[in-house]
């Protein structure tokens, strides 16, 4: 057998076991753990390459081969960092393994035939599409912005640029829920709606769940009282949906202990659990220590930088309909912004105590920066804290798995959609993001939605080849016409699906139901299940984890920043 140098092999087929890859311009390095292709039998498309008739491509009919194969991909997911071919059929992941022609090649698990399209993933990283669970539906254009960043599923609420939606992620009542489901039917992303959970009697909540929401949002701007919390969780337990909480910053109806008592050990998703985005001041951060609390962050506090504090005050005044000329409004805003808890938040993410990241889109958060900021935190923590104790080699594999889980599998588990999305696993919707390593986390090379390319960078349309500048992200065929209805999912509650909501509203997209929302616990949060004892000093706001002071220095320079956005 002929030999090839490791560098030449990587140049031709991408990295293999033992090779290391740097993520963008961060200090994060991953090492390939396994290679599911077969050395000497790799498939590659192009002139003089393998995927040709009678060679890597067989004679089987469409029923017996995949629709799409991503060749020689470096998969980065919560379950591993693995080199493999990825086969897609009928919009779902068919197999992860070895592609080729089973008539002449060994170990083939992904048959290639005349019906198979190829995406060349040699030298590329492939991740699952991101999931953003904190969406204010202020404008529909957020969907394309999110898709360009690598987010393919959006969970939240709202009705457009109304005061209520500027502040809260609630789509209130059956009429608005129906209209928003119809509007979202044409968006190129998966969606799930949250209803308004702020009532103390259950019938107004039940009718929203029956209308189609997959969760209820309790927000202090509508009154996050213990009675409302208890009522929403009671209905959630009854109808198997999730509850998301933005708790009472002003401590008017109780303190964090009262909110935890009202929750009563039941599963709940706490938004921006550090507190700058809202929640009991100054100690809502302590909630993430509890086994039933699924804590997330929104991205304006991630990572902690020199500008974080100054930026927040103006954001908060605008989003929560506050008046800078009213002293009480200013005091309310200032009570939420604490250097000490923001500095601790990054460390809690690195420890795996905070489980999810999200945006808070146009409402104190940036919809296109969930993925980017998650990796900036990972970089900052690598630089400040060094290698994690869980690492087993000279790489950052465990840290990378911890951080990618925060915006993929963990939000999917939290909201009962992990059976459909959230990871690169057989049977799940083929929502896949292809990255060049140098642009990882910043600018995808291709975003695949339900098996079709939905958006990608594209050069001059009148050029003789697709690459000449100016290059812009443009919607592709998977995001157009009736095709998008086959490539996306609308998530509904089980009650709504059983009641025929999709048929009554003439929704054209595929429907999936949420399930398992009430049994998921902090222990189920992949690589992010730590439940330490957390205390906050009421005077200094210092945060201690198991008695140890935790903090971080504000960054003055970040990777994945200006140098990537000069063009």
From Swiss-Prot:
| Active site: residue positions | 320 (proton donor)
Query: Do the record's keywords include Transcription?
Result: no
User: What are the TM regions of this chain, as residue ranges?
Assistant: none
* CC cofactor note: Binds 2 nickel ions per subunit.
Q: What is its main location?
A: cytoplasm
Give the record's family classification.
Belongs to the metallo-dependent hydrolases superfamily. Urease alpha subunit family.
Q: What is this protein called?
A: Urease subunit alpha
Origin organism is Klebsiella aerogenes
- Encoding gene, per UniProt annotation: ureC
């Amino acid at each position: 057998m002929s030999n090839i140098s490791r560098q030449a092999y990587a140049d031709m087929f991408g990295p293999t076991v033992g090779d290391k890859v740097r993520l963008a311009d961060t200090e994060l390095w991953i090492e390939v753990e396994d290679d599911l292709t077969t050395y000497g039998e790799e498939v590659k498309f192009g002139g003089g390459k393998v995927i040709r008739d009678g060679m890597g491509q067989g004679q089987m009919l469409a029923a017996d081969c995949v629709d799409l194969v991503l060749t020689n991909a470096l998969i980065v997911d919560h379950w591993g960092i693995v080199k493999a071919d990825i086969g897609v059929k009928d919009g779902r992941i068919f197999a992860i393994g070895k592609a080729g022609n089973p008539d002449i090649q060994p170990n083939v698990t992904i048959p290639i035939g005349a019906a198979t399209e190829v995406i060349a993933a040699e030298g590329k990283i492939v991740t699952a599409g991101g999931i953003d669970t904190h969406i204010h539906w202020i404008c529909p254009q957020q969907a394309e912005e999110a898709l360009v960043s690598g987010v393919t599923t959006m969970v939240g609420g709202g009705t457009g640029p109304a005061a209520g939606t500027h502040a809260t992620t609630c789509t209130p009542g059956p009429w608005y829920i129906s209209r928003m489901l119809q509007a979202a039917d044409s968006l190129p992303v998966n969606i799930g709606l949250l209803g308004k959970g702020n009532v103390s009697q259950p019938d107004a909540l039940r009718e929203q769940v029956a209308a189609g929401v997959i969760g209820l949002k309790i927000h202090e701007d509508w009154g996050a009282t213990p009675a409302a919390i208890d009522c929403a969780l009671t209905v959630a337990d009854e109808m198997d949906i999730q509850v998301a909480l933005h708790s009472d910053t002003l401590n008017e109806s109780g303190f964090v202990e009262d909110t935890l008592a009202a929750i009563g050990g039941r599963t709940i998703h706490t938004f921006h659990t550090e507190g700058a985005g809202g929640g009991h001041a100054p100690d809502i951060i302590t909630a993430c220590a509890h086994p039933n609390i699924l804590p997330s962050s929104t991205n304006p506090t991630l990572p902690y930088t020199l500008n974080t504090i100054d930026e927040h005050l103006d954001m908060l005044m605008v989003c929560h309909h506050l008046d800078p000329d009213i002293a009480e409004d200013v005091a309310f805003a200032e009570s939420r912004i604490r250097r000490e808890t923001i500095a601790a938040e990054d460390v809690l993410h690195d420890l795996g105590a905070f489980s999810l990241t999200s945006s808070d889109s146009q409402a104190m958060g940036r919809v296109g920066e969930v993925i980017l900021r998650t990796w900036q935190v990972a970089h900052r923590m690598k630089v400040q804290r060094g290698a994690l104790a869980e690492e087993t080699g000279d790489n950052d594999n465990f840290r990378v798995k911890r951080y990618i889980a925060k915006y993929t599998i963990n939000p999917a588990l939290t909201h009962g959609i992990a059976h459909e999305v959230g990871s690169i696993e057989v049977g799940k919707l083929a929502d896949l993001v292809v990255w060049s390593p140098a642009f990882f986390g910043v600018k995808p090379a291709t975003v695949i939605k339900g098996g079709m390319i939905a958006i990608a960078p594209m050069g001059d349309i009148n050029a003789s080849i697709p690459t000449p500048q100016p290059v812009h992200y443009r919607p592709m065929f998977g995001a157009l016409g009736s095709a998008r209805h086959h490539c996306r999912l609308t998530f509904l509650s089980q009650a709504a699906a059983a009641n025929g909501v999709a048929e009554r509203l003439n929704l054209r997209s595929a429907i999936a139901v949420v399930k398992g929302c009430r049994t998921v616990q902090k222990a189920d949060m992949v690589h992010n299940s730590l439940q330490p004892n957390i205390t906050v000093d009421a005077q200094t706001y210092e945060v201690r984890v198991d008695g140890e002071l935790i903090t971080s220095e504000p960054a003055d320079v970040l990777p994945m920043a200006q140098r990537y956005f000069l063009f």
